[in-house]
From Swiss-Prot:
Protein name (Swiss-Prot/TrEMBL): Protein DP71L
Family affiliation: Belongs to the asfivirus DP71L family.
Single GO BP term: symbiont-mediated suppression of host innate immune response
Function: Interacts with the host phosphatase PP1 catalytic subunit (PPP1CB) and recruits it to dephosphorylate EIF2S1/eIF2alpha and therefore restores the host translation that has been shut-down by the host. Also inhibits the EIF2S1/eIF2alpha-ATF4-DDIT3/CHOP pathway.
Source species: African swine fever virus (isolate Tick/Malawi/Lil 20-1/1983)
């Protein structure tokens, strides 16, 4: 069976579940619920959330979804919001009076911060005085170096020693090579 025939026989995927409004309070059941969409299309924005919520139930592992990929078919419409038609302030602000409570908090805040004295400083940076500073013992070079650094220092020292002794010994060894009978 050719790939083209397989594609043409494949059923068209159903659009995913739409978000339904959650259960409302018993006192608000008589109010109509409106569904407001930001965009007119039903394109969702989060495929992982759609999978978790069960929006991709009709997808199987063997389907080639990339061949007929369509955002409208694979994603949930996550850009819809449900709103109540009327606002019932009795249930919304249960026991909280906006004007008086907010006014009380603001007056307490202003009273507290008006009593706090803030000292303005001309200089932005301050350094500690000498008696507060901690004295640090200087470490020896050997204490700070690891074994690889000590090996490198030894190698340089031996190279210097060889170069210094070569100057002295080369003259003596050169004379021995020139007159081997003389020194025996």
């Amino acid at each position: 069976m050719s790939r083209r025939n397989k594609r043409s026989r494949r059923r068209r995927k159903k659009p995913l579940n739409t978000i339904q409004p959650g259960p409302s309070k018993p006192s608000a059941q008589d109010e109509p619920i409106k569904s407001v969409s930001h965009h007119s299309s039903k394109i969702g924005t989060n495929p992982m959330l759609a999978f978790i919520l069960g929006g991709n139930e009709d997808l199987s592992d063997d389907s080639d979804w990339d061949e007929d990929f369509s955002l409208e078919n694979t994603l949930m419409p996550l850009n819809e919001v449900s709103l109540k038609g009327k606002h019932d302030s009795k249930h919304f602000n249960k026991g909280f009076d906006n004007n008086t409570a907010l006014h009380e908090v603001n007056t307490k805040w202003e009273a507290f911060y008006s009593s706090v004295k803030i000292r303005q400083r001309d200089v932005k940076v301050y350094f500690a005085t000498d008696d507060i500073l901690i004295k640090v013992r200087e470490a020896d070079d050997i204490d700070r170096k690891g074994p690889w650094e000590q090996a490198a220092v030894d190698r340089l020292r031996f190279q210097r020693r060889i170069a210094d002794t070569e100057k002295i010994l080369s003259a003596v060894l050169l004379r021995k090579k020139l007159n081997p009978m003389e020194h025996e």
